[in-house]
Amino acid sequence: MKRLLSTLLIGIMLLTFAPSAFAKQDGKRTSELAHEAKSAVLIERDTGKVLYNKNSNERLAPASMTKIMTMLLIMEALDKGKIKMSDKVRTSEHAASMGGSQIFLEPGEEMTVKEMLKGIAIASGNDASVAMAEFISGSEEEFVKKMNKKAKELGLKNTSFKNPTGLTEEGHYSSAYDMAIMAKELLKYESITKFTGTYEDYLRENTDKKFWLVNTNRLIKFYPGVDGVKTGYTGEAKYCLTASAKKGNMRAIAVVFGASTPKERNAQVTKMLDFAFSQYETHPLYKRNQTVAKVKVKKGKQKFIELTTSEPISILTKKGEDMNDVKKEIKMKDNISAPIQKGQELGTLVLKKDGEVLAESPVAAKEDMKKAGFITFLKRTMGDWTKFK
């Protein structure tokens, strides 16, 4: 059982949250947002609130939107220091043999992680995706295991990966909702939009094989605020897109599966984004990695450890509603004791209004904490004993 560490009234002016505002859709207007797609979903990034959905849990071929998970695992490896942007990645014969969209890597060719990430995010390179999979995990098969493990960690119930590219393969599927959650997780790493939000760039500059990259997501150029995330197309999947756009404090993620043409795909995503920004607004409360509390640690080298947010935390409301305040609660896990690793989840931050939960998000250790040595532990025990003497 979890115990309540603290309850703090946040004296901030926020718009009133009404659960029915998100459960009820605005009739005819929302029914026409993605009427040509097989499935679609619209969420707000910080809160994950679903603003619109159409068959969003249907299992369908995701095509190259698969690379959202591929990029997520790359960004995680970078964040944990397992790889660096400057690392050289050598292309295997297997990676170079990938068909479909590619950056035409040759066996033995080397590019940096940064260059490979450009090739994946901008040009949807299948060869670059497999090269990075092999670089991180040793083989494509081991990387796919990581992809499915991460999907399970994120609670995705309608996703199964067979490759890191999205090329058609039996048993390879996802859903609009699951894809939106993957994009939500990827966008925690804000630097990813430097890649996904770039419309054109070059690889192999200053060589006779200079290669022009043009983003397959045309909305980056034509819809203000769009900076990601990934398109997809195969004969089975048809035209797909997971798009992200930011306006003011609000970031929306719109996903479309199975549109008949690129024009139709972009039009439906545009309608969803327009709807999100015209009807809702986001109120940021915490940035990612912001310190929110500290907790006592048993047997630690230090007595207390600071807790930080694991993602941006905001409240989403309909526009024009009344203002009110919000309560913050931090529910800690029982028996927190050293050793503790940086980033280890130690509790949950809960935001409530009038008893209704508005948002929940994990809080994690700000830094590593080793177990106290014998001398430290003895001094602390003696100090505690003298206090009660």
UniProtKB/Swiss-Prot annotation:
GO terms for cellular component: extracellular region. Pathway: Cell wall biogenesis; peptidoglycan biosynthesis. It is an enzyme of class 3 (hydrolase). Its main location: secreted. Keywords: Carboxypeptidase, Cell shape, Cell wall biogenesis/degradation, Hydrolase, Peptidoglycan synthesis, Protease, Secreted, Signal. It is found in: Secreted. Substrate binds at residue 230. It comes from the Bacteria. GO terms for biological process: cell wall organization; peptidoglycan biosynthetic process; proteolysis; regulation of cell shape. The keyword Endoplasmic reticulum does not apply. Residues 1-23 form the signal peptide. The keyword Hydrolase applies. The active site is at residues 64, 67, 124. It holds the Pfam family Peptidase_S11. Its EC number is 3.4.16.4. InterPro entries: Beta-lactam/transpept-like (IPR012338), Peniciliin-bd_prot_C_sf (IPR015956), Peptidase_S11 (IPR018044), Peptidase_S11_C (IPR012907), Peptidase_S11_C_sf (IPR037167), Peptidase_S11_N (IPR001967). It catalyses: Preferential cleavage: (Ac)2-L-Lys-D-Ala-|-D-Ala. Also transpeptidation of peptidyl-alanyl moieties that are N-acyl substituents of D-alanine. GO terms for molecular function: serine-type D-Ala-D-Ala carboxypeptidase activity. SUPFAM superfamilies: beta-lactamase/transpeptidase-like (SSF56601), Penicillin-binding protein associated domain (SSF69189). Removes C-terminal D-alanyl residues from sugar-peptide cell wall precursors. Belongs to the peptidase S11 family. PANTHER family: D-ALANYL-D-ALANINE CARBOXYPEPTIDASE, TRAFFICKING PROTEIN PARTICLE COMPLEX SUBUNIT 12. This is D-alanyl-D-alanine carboxypeptidase DacF.
